[in-house]
Structures are given as structure tokens and as C-alpha cells.
């Protein structure tokens, strides 16, 4: 059994940052966490959005009514061969940021799940990446949101050298809102690529080098499946 984390994703990085021990128990020891209704609902909504865009679902479920306009637009774009759209895809890279496939177990270093990405209509070559969120938008998590957008941008710029820029965004389906807000996008160009690569290499370095996985008590411990009071292996 491996004693270190050898590959990563944004969600794996987020869990490690919350608590190294939780990351070990979940990703190395493979101690499975039970599902919950919020996760099941999120999966259902993501699947419904995918099916609607692809034309496999004719009617939107009520949970997606607040983002109906963007979904109808994406559905129309999906029909066009030139749209350059991907829906529910996984982008994967090696340690040198070379493109690979998600199931390259020997060399894949990072996996990035993409809900939908499409090219904007017009002369400029712009890729819009949209991540569906079923939870609530929280202002205090802005730093985390920016990190996620940076990773999307890094991957897109690496994959598509012809792009003028990338505009990643989060879409909160329950609230019908986008972050960043409409008209105020965060843009990334190819000049940002080497900076983003170094930034993410630095961010994940401690996670990939960790061999002790010290627990990190915090406010989320009360919800953790591995907590002591739940009969878990954690001391807290």
C-alpha cells in the first residue's frame, strides 16, 4: 500500500488542506465515507445538466430552472461542430504538464474534471469553462474559488495553444448566479501559464511529500466521518 499521495485533483488538494489525516484515510487507506443526500442531489443535477446539453433530456428538472437560459444556450452550441465544446470530461497531465489520460496510472499526476467548456462566438479565441455548483456561494471562500479557476485556466491553456484567453467561472444552480459576476470575468492568457504551473507545483508540494499526515483539528471535525465520536480512527 502506498504511503504517500502520488497524484492529485482539486478536490484531493482541498481535503488535504482541510486536514492531512483525513486525506490519508480517504485517499491512501481508502476508508470509504458514506454518501449523503447533498452529494446525491449534486450528482443528479450535474447529470441532468449534462444530458440536457447533449439533447438526451428534453425537459429541465425544476432544480435547474434558475440557470435555464445558459443551459439552453449551451445545448444550442453543442449541436455546432465548431463549438469546441466538452461536457463532463477529465483533463489529465503528467508532472511535466504533458497531456495524458486519466487512467494512465503510471504517469498521470493531476486530474481535472470539467463540467462544460465551450468557445465563445466571435473573432477572439476564448474558452469559457463553467463549473456547476449546487451548494451556496460563500464570500469567505473566495480564495478557494480563485484557486479552482486558476487550475481550470492552467489546464485549458496547456491543452489549447491557439487560445487568446480563458474565462473560467462557477455557476451556482440553486441561486442562478455566476462567480465571477457577469461582465466582470477573470481572464487568463498564455503569459500566465508558467506562473500558474509554478504556483500549483508549490501548492501541492507539501501534500505530495507528506509521510506523517498530522491531523488538523478544525470546525469541520464535527461533520467528519473519521472523527473519534463516530468511532473513527482519528483522535479528535
What are these regions (language model features)?
Residues 3-4, 21-32, 129, 133, ...:
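Short amphipathic alpha-helical segments and their helix-coil junctions
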Residues 5-18, 107-119, 188-193:
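An acidic intrinsically disordered interaction segment
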Residues 5-58, 88-89, 223:
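Nuclease catalytic cores
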Residues 7-8, 89, 96, 139-142, ...:
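Metal-dependent nuclease catalytic regions and adjoining charged, substrate-binding loops involved
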Residues 44, 147-155:
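Short amphipathic alpha-helical face segments that pack within enzyme cores
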Amino acid at each position: 500500500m502506498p504511503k504517500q499521495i502520488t497524484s492529485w485533483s482539486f478536490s484531493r488538494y482541498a481535503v488535504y488542506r482541510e486536514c492531512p489525516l483525513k486525506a490519508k484515510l480517504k485517499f491512501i487507506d481508502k476508508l470509504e465515507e458514506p454518501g449523503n443526500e447533498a452529494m446525491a442531489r449534486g450528482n443528479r443535477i450535474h447529470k441532468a445538466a449534462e444530458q440536457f446539453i447533449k439533447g438526451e433530456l428534453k425537459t429541465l428538472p425544476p432544480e435547474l430552472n434558475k440557470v435555464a437560459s445558459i443551459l439552453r444556450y449551451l445545448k444550442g452550441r453543442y449541436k455546432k461542430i465548431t463549438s469546441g465544446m466538452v461536457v463532463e470530461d477529465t483533463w489529465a497531465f503528467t508532472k511535466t504538464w504533458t497531456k495524458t489520460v486519466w487512467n494512465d496510472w503510471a504517469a498521470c499526476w493531476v486530474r481535472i474534471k470539467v463540467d462544460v467548456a465551450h468557445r465563445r462566438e466571435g473573432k477572439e479565441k476564448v474558452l469559457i469553462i463553467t463549473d456547476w455548483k449546487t451548494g451556496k456561494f460563500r464570500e469567505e471562500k473566495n480564495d478557494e474559488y480563485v484557486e479552482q479557476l486558476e487550475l481550470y485556466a492552467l489546464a485549458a491553456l496547456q491543452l489549447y495553444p491557439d487560445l487568446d484567453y480563458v474565462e473560467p467561472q462557477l455557476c451556482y444552480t440553486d441561486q442562478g448566479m455566476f462567480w465571477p459576476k457577469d461582465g466582470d470575468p477573470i481572464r487568463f492568457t498564455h503569459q500566465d501559464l508558467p506562473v500558474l504551473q509554478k504556483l500549483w507545483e508549490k501548492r501541492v508540494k507539501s501534500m505530495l511529500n507528506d509521510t506523517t499526515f498530522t491531523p488538523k483539528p478544525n470546525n469541520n471535525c464535527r461533520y467528519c466521518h473519521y472523527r473519534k465520536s463516530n468511532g473513527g480512527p482519528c483522535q479528535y
